[in-house]
């Protein structure tokens, strides 16, 4: 089978949607299928997109990557929709796709096709919601990636099935508790990830006598560098490789994520794959991080509350071990090959052999 994976916007965004596409694409190839990725555009002067995509997402297999356009500095919603409507179906047919799995719903004249609803919808206008509702009606199946997504899309589309996010578990090598450093890891440097909340929470822990440091992993951020320049207990690791990020995360005592919006809980899943207890905000779906089972949940953005949650993990070895073990067991359901098999079962239902 030849599967086309669609990214509505830019394939070079370093976000959860492209991580989803990367992991699912590799899993399909491991299962013996042909795969290509088609996106609207890419950012910057990136040669050999397939090789770049493989490296940045920590894949073992290179996947073909094509775009409708060349480099674009920003995602232009109306232009994207027009391009997908006029060019998308033709491109899929040219590349002999048997099915399209579309991430970021678009008007594409091709069948059969599956839409994957990712969210969040917090910044979507009333007009855009109406457009989304119409677009989803043109798809053969709609998949939600979590119960939170299913709830969020209620009123726009009814999800036919819930299939979890694909995660490449072999990339994570958890360290034993006694080998771990006194590190707290925060992932994400954009303002929505609230890294300064994490910085203040760790500062409070240090004021209480805990000898811990904070490592912030994410894209390069000048504003964040200015804000924390005087805080010697914080290390910024901008634009690190997947291998280095996972190595740090798997050696930490905890991961903290006081996010205001979390469409893709990949940071939480990666922490769990490391056996590193995540301390997360209300923005992370509660079917991913279960309080006191696979992590700790905080219902505010107050640094004191995050400091208190982190302190529980630092002081209570029994709680830390309980979450560590449960997280490692729970995350197995996100194995990218098993997730790909769920998609293939759905595709088999849709594409019935002709006699």
Model-based region annotation:
Residues 175-193, 199-203:
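Conserved donor-binding/catalytic core segment of Leloir-type glycosyltransferases
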